[in-house]
Structure formats: structure tokens, C-alpha cells
């Protein structure tokens, strides 16, 4: 039953046997289009997975979602930034359509913003095409918030209530089987899922438990003088979530160990200088603990799927030295569905200096389409020709492969 208390949303969950299922909703005499979902059996031989994030409504159309629907994946993994909280911007330049009012802070405003985004027909088609596994990032609440610390210190007094409203609206408007949040309490959304014995997913929450970003949350400053990043107790995930992650990986019997992650995990520093303190680079001891665990336990077939940064990149994860240390996993960073990227030529040159980075594409929007079998993981990076054109074509930029048992990425294109 859809009620006003839950913004007239429903979370319909039933016992489904493996196979393809089709569904629809009927309300008020109106019948929805038919949706498709696939439930994995105990030992599936393949998985087609679309990994996507960052769909700022104002800065582009959703041609990438149209392509996702056409590709008919088994599963869509959403890595965060389903909505953006910003107020309306004038149309022109990179803005192709506008938000419906000022920056959102209340439950009604967050609900209205979800309704606006979900009115897009290409996003609707992507939801109807496959089951979704959804996580949040920061813009579901506010840019670069950290636990109960807002981006702007002047907003601290009302931030807890704002976060409560945002978390509730997220639960109401996303396809999740989690219980609804309770105001003024932790809302645990980090969790696990599985695609039979082919892939074990661990979805991380890199916002609710983290220490505030160091050194003023600087971006592109390349300042190596930030001792704060190694202050005792700094964390990206919090103690309980770190234990949860390690326990799942240590106990996994699946072929592939997949981590749904928000910000870049690979080392993206240059001679010790941090490019972006919001990424795992701003929490080096937390990353070092995790990579040391992966190496010590010899966790096989680790694939980290990342969004947030609005660029496409492929990275090799190594313990210790990022150029020569032991390989502990692969990271596939998918670009944004529509959110503006970093296209400055100087930044492209900076990226080429990262020892852990194998390839990058900064200009285009899109997503990553992964094909998984027991033998290999293949990542196809799909890019939108023109995000300002609702009818834009979508093409393949590159394909990258990890052979099972290696944790090593090779460029296939």
C-alpha cells in the first residue's frame, strides 16, 4: 500500500525463483510499462553488469541510461549521486535543463527532487530494464559532507535534521530492501549481495562514518604539506564497516569479490602531493590497512567499482609502492552519466603521472558495462558523444580485462 507517510512509494519484495521476471504497477487506473528483473541461480555462468553514477539533471541528458536499457544488463550497480542538491541554475552553457527551486534541505524538497529526476524517460527505461543495486554518495545529502559535518561550517546547526530528511527520501525513492531510517540514528546501508557463486558484492558507505576531509578539502592544489591526513584515528569507513568488509572478503567463496565504492581507492598522489582530499588519498592509513589485509590474506579476484569523480579510468591496486608493490586488485572507475567532468588539459597531464593508472578518459560522460564469467572480468567503457543532446549516440571507448586468479588488468582495445 502506498501512503503519504512514504511519499506514496512502495518496496515490493517477493520470493522469486531464478530466471527472468516481468512486472508492472497498476494504480488509480493507470498501468505502468512492463519492467524486467533477473534473479541469479546458485551457479550462474555469466553476469552483465552496468556500473553508473552521478546524474546531475541540469548538466546533461540521460543518453547513457537509454543505452543501459538497450544493452539489457542483468543488474545495474548504482554507485551514488542519484540526485544533486543544488539550486536551479540559469539555462545556457553546460546547463540544458533546470532544477525546480533553491538548494534542497527539507524532506518535501528532497522528495520533489527525486520526482523531478525520475520524470526522465531514459532513466525510467533503465530502471525498467534490470534490477538495481543502489548505494549513495554525497549529493543525496550535500556535496562532500562527512558524517555530521556539512560542507559549509555555517550550516552545522541544522545539518543533522537535513541529513535525516535526505536519508529518508533516499530510502523512499530507491529500489532497496532496507528498512526505513530512524531519525537521529545511524542508518546502516553498507551491506552485501551475491550473484550466485559467481560474484560476491560488498557495498560501502564512504560518507556516513568518515572523518572530515583534511586540509580544507582542497582539490587540485597539489600541496604535499598536509600532515593532518595521517592524524591518528582518521577513517573513511569507520571501525565497524572496516571489520564488515574484511570479514566478507575473508569468508567469501565466490569467484569474484566485488566492492561497490564511491571515491577513487587507487593511489592518485604525485610525489606525496594529494590531488583530492575527498578520495581515499585523503585517508592513506585506512587504505594501507585495507591493502595490507588483501595482501596478507591473498584475497583473489578483487574488483573495485568506483564512481564520484566524473571521469573514466582504470587502475591497478598495489600494496605499498603504487608502481611496484604487490598487486591486490583492479579498480574500474566509471565516468558520470551526465555530471560535468574535469576537462582541463593540465589535469589530463597530471593523470598521466599516476603510477597506478593504466588509462583515463576525461571528456565524455557515460558508464561501464561489465561482462563477468568464471574465467575473466571484462569492462567496456561506454561514452556519450554529446551529453547536451538527448538523442546522442553512445560508443565504446575501451575494453579492459582481468583474468581470474591474477588481479591484474590488461588493456584489450
Predicted segments, located by residue:
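Metal-dependent phosphoester/phosphodiester hydrolase catalytic core
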Residues: 1-413
Amino acid at each position: 500500500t502506498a501512503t503519504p507517510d512514504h511519499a506514496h512509494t512502495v518496496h515490493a519484495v517477493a520470493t522469486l525463483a531464478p530466471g527472468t521476471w516481468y512486472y508492472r504497477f497498476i494504480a488509480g487506473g493507470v498501468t505502468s510499462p512492463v519492467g524486467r528483473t533477473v534473479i541469479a541461480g546458485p551457479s550462474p555462468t555469466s553476469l552483465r553488469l552496468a556500473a553508473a553514477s552521478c546524474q546531475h539533471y541540469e548538466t546533461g541528458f540521460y543518453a547513457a541510461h537509454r543505452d543501459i536499457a538497450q544493452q539489457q544488463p542483468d543488474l545495474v550497480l548504482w554507485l551514488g549521486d542519484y540526485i544533486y542538491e543544488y539550486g536551479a541554475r540559469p539555462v545556457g552553457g553546460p546547463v540544458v535543463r533546470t532544477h525546480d527551486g533553491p538548494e534542497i534541505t527539507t524532506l518535501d524538497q528532497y522528495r520533489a527532487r527525486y520526482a523531478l529526476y525520475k520524470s526522465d524517460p531514459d532513466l525510467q527505461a533503465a530502471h525498467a530494464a534490470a534490477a538495481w543495486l543502489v548505494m549513495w554518495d554525497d549529493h543525496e545529502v550535500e556535496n562532500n559532507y562527512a558524517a555530521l559535518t556539512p560542507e559549509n561550517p555555517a550550516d552545522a546547526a541544522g545539518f543533522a535534521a537535513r541529513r535525516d530528511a535526505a536519508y529518508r527520501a533516499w530510502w523512499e525513492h530507491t529500489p532497496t530492501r532496507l528498512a526505513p531510517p530512524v531519525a537521529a540514528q545511524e542508518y546502516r546501508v553498507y551491506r552485501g549481495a551475491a550473484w550466485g557463486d559467481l560474484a560476491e558484492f560488498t557495498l560501502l558507505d564512504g560518507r556516513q562514518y568518515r572523518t572530515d576531509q583534511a586540509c580544507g578539502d582542497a582539490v587540485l592544489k597539489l600541496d604535499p604539506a598536509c600532515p593532518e591526513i595521517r592524524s591518528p584515528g582518521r577513517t573513511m569507513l569507520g571501525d565497524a564497516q572496516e571489520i564488515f568488509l574484511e570479514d566478507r572478503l575473508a569468508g567469501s567463496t565466490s569467484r569474484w569479490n566485488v566492492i561497490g565504492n564511491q571515491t577513487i581507492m587507487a593511489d592518485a598522489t604525485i610525489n606525496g602531493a594529494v590531488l583530492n582530499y575527498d578520495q581515499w588519498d585523503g585517508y592513506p592509513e585506512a587504505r594501507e590497512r585495507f591493502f595490507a589485509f588483501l595482501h596478507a590474506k591473498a584475497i583473489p579476484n578483487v574488483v573495485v567499482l568506483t564512481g564520484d569523480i566524473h571521469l573514466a579510468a582504470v587502475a591497478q591496486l598495489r600494496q605499498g609502492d603504487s608502481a611496484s608493490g604487490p598487486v591486490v586488485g583492479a579498480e574500474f572507475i566509471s565516468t558520470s552519466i551526465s555530471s560535468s567532468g574535469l576537462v582541463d588539459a593540465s589535469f589530463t597531464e597530471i593523470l598521466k603521472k599516476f603510477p597506478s593508472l593504466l588509462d583515463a578518459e576525461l571528456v565524455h560522460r557515460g558508464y561501464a558495462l561489465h561482462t563477468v564469467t568464471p574465467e575473466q572480468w571484462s569492462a567496456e567503457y561506454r561514452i556519450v558523444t554529446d551529453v547536451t543532446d538527448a538523442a546522442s549516440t553512445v560508443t565504446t571507448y575501451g575494453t579492459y580485462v582481468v583474468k581470474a586468479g591474477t588481479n591484474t588488468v590488461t588493456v584489450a582495445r
